[in-house]
Amino acid sequence: MTVPKEIPEKWARAGAPPSWSQKKPSWGTEEERRARANDREYNEKFQYASNCIKTSKYNIVTFLPVNLFEQFQEVANTYFLFLLILQLIPQISSLSWFTTIVPLVLVLTITAVKDATDDYFRHKSDNQVNNRHSQVLINGVLQQEQWMNVCVGDIIKLENNQFVAADLLLLSSSEPHGLCYIETAELDGETNMKVRQAIPVTSELGDVSQLARFDGEVICEPPNNKLDKFSGTLYWKENKFPLSNQNMLLRGCVLRNTEWCFGLVIFAGPDTKLMQNSGRTKFKRTSIDRLMNTLVLWIFGFLVCMGVILAIGNAIWEHEVGTRFQVYLPWDEAVDSAFFSGFLSFWSYIIILNTVVPISLYVSVEVIRLGHSYFINWDKKMFCMKKRTPAEARTTTLNEELGQVEYIFSDKTGTLTQNIMVFNKCSINGHSYGDVFDVLGHKAELGERPEPVDFSFNPLADKKFLFWDSSLLEAVKMGDPHTHEFFRLLSLCHTVMSEEKNEGELYYKAQSPDEGALVTAARNFGFVFRSRTPKTITVHELGTAITYQLLAILDFNNIRKRMSVIVRNPEGKIRLYCKGADTILLDRLHPPTQELLSSTTDHLNEYAGDGLRTLVLAYKDLDEEYYEEWARRRLQASLAQDSREDRLASIYEEVESDMMLLGATAIEDKLQQGVPETIALLTLANIKIWVLTGDKQETAVNIGYSCKMLTDDMTEVFVVTGHTVLEVREELRKARKKMVDSSHAVGNGFTYQGNLSSSKLTSVLEAVAGEYALVINGHSLAHALEADMELEFLETACACKAVICCRVTPLQKAQVVELVKKYKKAVTLAIGDGANDVSMIKTAHIGVGISGQEGIQAVLASDYSFSQFKFLQRLLLVHGRWSYLRMCKFLCYFFYKNFAFTMVHFWFGFFCGFSAQTVYDQYFITLYNIVYTSLPVLAMGVFDQDVPEQRSMEYPKLYEPGQLNLLFNKREFFICIAQGIYTSVLMFFIPYGVFAEATRDDGTQLADYQSFAVTVATSLVIVVSVQIGLDTGYWTAINHFFIWGSLAVYFAILFAMHSNGLFDMFPNQFRFVGNAQNTLAQPTVWLTIALTTAVCIMPVVAFRFLRLSLKPDLSDTVRYTQLVRKKQKAQHRCMRRVGRTGSRRSGYAFSHQEGFGELIMSGKNMRLSSLALSSFSTRSSSSWIESLRRKKSDSANSPSGGAEKPLKG
């Protein structure tokens, strides 16, 4: 092959440095990919990655060292390894090494088994994929090769229904013109077929011998993750040919409806776009995780302080007192320095007191989160029967964060709406079609409409298509030229593929539901798109087959927001047909009659007001000479290696101008079931919902009213449409001024200051009286998100009850979410269903994917997924609230029980000469956290609930404590620590005081170290068991079994450890022989245990009774209400048993209940629950919740500190 002179010098070199291997060195990156067909020796110079994929992390040799290295990246594991090393030093260790190594090994083993299991399945999947077979052309012969042995530059033969082994350049196929059909479900989840086409120069290479002689070279972009873009050039026979994404078959696709095709491997293995897109999602941590890390550091500091205090005590005691005992006690070799003695004592006490930060905490947290995730996955009420799709928790680390959400960012299409498009109305030459009027000229409602239009004249019509305005069909039959041209455009300007399984049975495969709806409408009105080839489109126009020559497709993208086709009709006339967004197309029209533009614009506004999705249609005639010249420049732009897309966009911009307006379409996208009720319920839970959509303003606003985000009761809906920074700033400031002036008028006493600094914006949130909404367009949002305006935008938006951002790009969606995350101390959730929502989903604290019509990219990027928006209320108000409640109660109890356990050693230090002697038996220390107290707290953390799920939905105000971090924060932590320290004081000093004077039954002294240890340990286990019984709000059989079972296990192990049998076998290890039997046989000991338990528990019980009586929280009020209802129902049942009456009053009561049921079904009672609740919540938490919300806002910096206007319940 000869390289043309036009190739840049860097491409004309014979070779390139081997810096593009699978493991690319840090000093080199691949700037371009060169692949020559049938020349492995040449391609091996570049050391490209092989086609072997590896998603596994370990092998048999590396598993143990690598996994241990990864686990010791965790600070907690490293901390406990450090303690283990300390325990191996005899001079400072007062505990056996197994007290730390047993829990540590247990944790490491559990994690390692989990990692090994996950990696085993990755290995299994890798082997399954790598060992698939493909037909590869080697030395002129097709041979069966494993996928892992395929190399860049190889030519592969694919057959129907086979997976594509690597990223291939399509060379030829069994279909005419080098076409082939693929399914991309594994890439983007879309099951509709897509068409790919070989370039004409290679489409005739269908023979193996011809392909064996093919030596073309492809020079293209380096590996990247852009699924919809490819730019390259084929050099062959002294010519160059542009390549695009339409010529590529990507790994993971499946060949469909094509007998065979040949492709040239461009990217292999980890360089394929599928693997480039399988990178790890950013790891998300919850606010509780971050708080817990801070608290653990504080605890460690507290541990060091205790160690220092006891070390100083040891140094003083050794110097002042210790020498007196050396005369008659066995003593280690005297330490020369009291300071050194204190130093050794410090490390000894660090070892003993380390249980304030138990290693089992981290394992327990993960187990609880895993249980919560399974509850979400198993929830039948979040299972969609129609799609057979369950809810899925795709992560286990964010469950409790679901109970703290304050902002929801939602896509509209496919998320709030069904994304099932229906052709509803249209405007043609200034005439609107779609509405039906009665004899009096009034618009008929849906239930009053006549029969739909009869399309029986058209044997190819889609029987599922419904349209109500028969005048449009009459215009078609009458031969109206504008109407014919309108539907001709819809039948030609698209990328839909048709499939005809039987004669007359057409099936359309559209890349978007909008296109499918438009082509189906044209089909029913007599303009039937029948088939296409790369160069032609065949349409049956009112029964006559007409084939148009397809000259060019100017494809749609998010920037252009339009698509066009250029066709030549049988008479040789060239015409451009274009459809796109009104904001784009109306600026590119030939000045028509003012009347046509005005009427079409009015229709567009009317359609948008009805919540319909609109497109404008236009056309333009091209003369042959202009088209030839334009096509030549388009070819040059498509061959450009630099800025190819920008050059093509400029060429497209030129031809898509001075067009003639033809009309507009309006497509209906209905709301999903339950959306208004869900939004109303979440709003009552003080969750703010922002809709971020690409639709036009009128459509978005109408959907806002439909789903009850916007209401007629709102004080004002602000619309920001400025085109410059100054205009946007002025509109935002006017909105804030109106809100504040209104609040001042009702006596809030807030003074507005016109010049707000970006560093100290006056918080409007506390001053706003009334309900406001903000609607902002994409071009205005671009200015509002600039660095010097973002705070003003956020301040205004956060003061509003609802925010709708229209005409926004995927990047702007992510920027809005990032803005709220940056300045607001609030948890954000983003929910969407399409690829354009992925960036928003990944940016938010929590990402939720809807499995809908737009593929599964949003689901793959999400943390949670389900099939309908209405399930969001259950995810947050039930699973999220419960997960937060359970995790908070678990952490409070866990810190309490460990401080109660550990601090006893601290007090004992003052009575044992600061000798680092432990109170408990070393086996009790080892088993306390992993056997005696682990299962009860796990059961509470997994199963506990304060109110039933129905009440969580009925009283959304119950959600607020999570938003305010009321259940676990620094204050609650210190309360738990104080309770733990209080318990430890009583558990040490009560037995100590009793044992000082008590005697046994035989009159001998009761006090000895071993009896004291057994008494304190037994008291501890009983106290913490009673405490968790008080903390448990929802008792199950599992809770009973774990709590009482743990107590039974404790006594069983205690008596076993102190038995003669174990002492005889291991006399050096089990030295408490017979102690348990002797100690627990004494009535004084049981009285001491009972006294200790009562004194530890009674203050807690008293405090809770007082709080319940004087200051109950909302969940207490709801539980009380439920008890009252149950008693009333029981009384009614008793009354019915006493006697029956025939009074009409019972009939009236029954009919009244029927009416209330209709009210519930209508959704109008959404506020009723809150209002009804307020009747008995004067003693409840509404006031203190709101005061805490105000306190939170006052203590925070503006605007993050601004609290939202509380919703009155």
UniProtKB/Swiss-Prot annotation:
<feature type="binding site">
    <location>
        <position position="836"/>
    </location>
    <ligand>
        <name>ATP</name>
    </ligand>
</feature>
<feature type="topological domain" description="Cytoplasmic">
    <location>
        <begin position="1104"/>
        <end position="1209"/>
    </location>
</feature>
<feature type="topological domain" description="Exoplasmic loop">
    <location>
        <begin position="994"/>
        <end position="1011"/>
    </location>
</feature>
<feature type="topological domain" description="Exoplasmic loop">
    <location>
        <begin position="920"/>
        <end position="922"/>
    </location>
</feature>
<dbReference type="GO" id="GO:0005886">
    <property type="term" value="C:plasma membrane"/>
</dbReference>
<keyword id="KW-0479">Metal-binding</keyword>
<dbReference type="InterPro" id="IPR032630">
    <property type="entry name" value="P_typ_ATPase_c"/>
</dbReference>
<feature type="transmembrane region" description="Helical">
    <location>
        <begin position="296"/>
        <end position="316"/>
    </location>
</feature>
<feature type="topological domain" description="Exoplasmic loop">
    <location>
        <begin position="90"/>
        <end position="91"/>
    </location>
</feature>
<keyword id="KW-0547">Nucleotide-binding</keyword>
<feature type="transmembrane region" description="Helical">
    <location>
        <begin position="899"/>
        <end position="919"/>
    </location>
</feature>
<dbReference type="InterPro" id="IPR023299">
    <property type="entry name" value="ATPase_P-typ_cyto_dom_N"/>
</dbReference>
<feature type="binding site">
    <location>
        <position position="411"/>
    </location>
    <ligand>
        <name>Mg(2+)</name>
    </ligand>
</feature>
<feature type="binding site">
    <location>
        <position position="813"/>
    </location>
    <ligand>
        <name>ATP</name>
    </ligand>
</feature>
<feature type="binding site">
    <location>
        <position position="515"/>
    </location>
    <ligand>
        <name>ATP</name>
    </ligand>
</feature>
<keyword id="KW-0067">ATP-binding</keyword>
<dbReference type="InterPro" id="IPR044492">
    <property type="entry name" value="P_typ_ATPase_HD_dom"/>
</dbReference>
<keyword id="KW-0597">Phosphoprotein</keyword>
<protein>
    <recommendedName>
        <fullName>Phospholipid-transporting ATPase ID</fullName>
        <ecNumber>7.6.2.1</ecNumber>
    </recommendedName>
</protein>
<dbReference type="InterPro" id="IPR023214">
    <property type="entry name" value="HAD_sf"/>
</dbReference>
<feature type="binding site">
    <location>
        <position position="695"/>
    </location>
    <ligand>
        <name>ATP</name>
    </ligand>
</feature>
<dbReference type="GO" id="GO:0090554">
    <property type="term" value="F:phosphatidylcholine floppase activity"/>
</dbReference>
<feature type="binding site">
    <location>
        <position position="693"/>
    </location>
    <ligand>
        <name>ATP</name>
    </ligand>
</feature>
<feature type="binding site">
    <location>
        <position position="613"/>
    </location>
    <ligand>
        <name>ATP</name>
    </ligand>
</feature>
<feature type="binding site">
    <location>
        <position position="837"/>
    </location>
    <ligand>
        <name>Mg(2+)</name>
    </ligand>
</feature>
<keyword id="KW-0812">Transmembrane</keyword>
<comment type="subunit">
    <text>Component of a P4-ATPase flippase complex which consists of a catalytic alpha subunit ATP8B2 and an accessory beta subunit TMEM30A or TMEM30B.</text>
</comment>
<feature type="binding site">
    <location>
        <position position="807"/>
    </location>
    <ligand>
        <name>ATP</name>
    </ligand>
</feature>
<dbReference type="Pfam" id="PF16209">
    <property type="entry name" value="PhoLip_ATPase_N"/>
</dbReference>
<keyword id="KW-0445">Lipid transport</keyword>
<keyword id="KW-0813">Transport</keyword>
<feature type="binding site">
    <location>
        <position position="413"/>
    </location>
    <ligand>
        <name>ATP</name>
    </ligand>
</feature>
<dbReference type="InterPro" id="IPR006539">
    <property type="entry name" value="P-type_ATPase_IV"/>
</dbReference>
<feature type="binding site">
    <location>
        <position position="833"/>
    </location>
    <ligand>
        <name>Mg(2+)</name>
    </ligand>
</feature>
<feature type="active site" description="4-aspartylphosphate intermediate">
    <location>
        <position position="411"/>
    </location>
</feature>
<dbReference type="GO" id="GO:0005789">
    <property type="term" value="C:endoplasmic reticulum membrane"/>
</dbReference>
<feature type="binding site">
    <location>
        <position position="579"/>
    </location>
    <ligand>
        <name>ATP</name>
    </ligand>
</feature>
<feature type="binding site">
    <location>
        <position position="556"/>
    </location>
    <ligand>
        <name>ATP</name>
    </ligand>
</feature>
<feature type="topological domain" description="Exoplasmic loop">
    <location>
        <begin position="317"/>
        <end position="338"/>
    </location>
</feature>
<feature type="region of interest" description="Disordered">
    <location>
        <begin position="1179"/>
        <end position="1209"/>
    </location>
</feature>
<feature type="topological domain" description="Cytoplasmic">
    <location>
        <begin position="944"/>
        <end position="972"/>
    </location>
</feature>
<dbReference type="Pfam" id="PF13246">
    <property type="entry name" value="Cation_ATPase"/>
</dbReference>
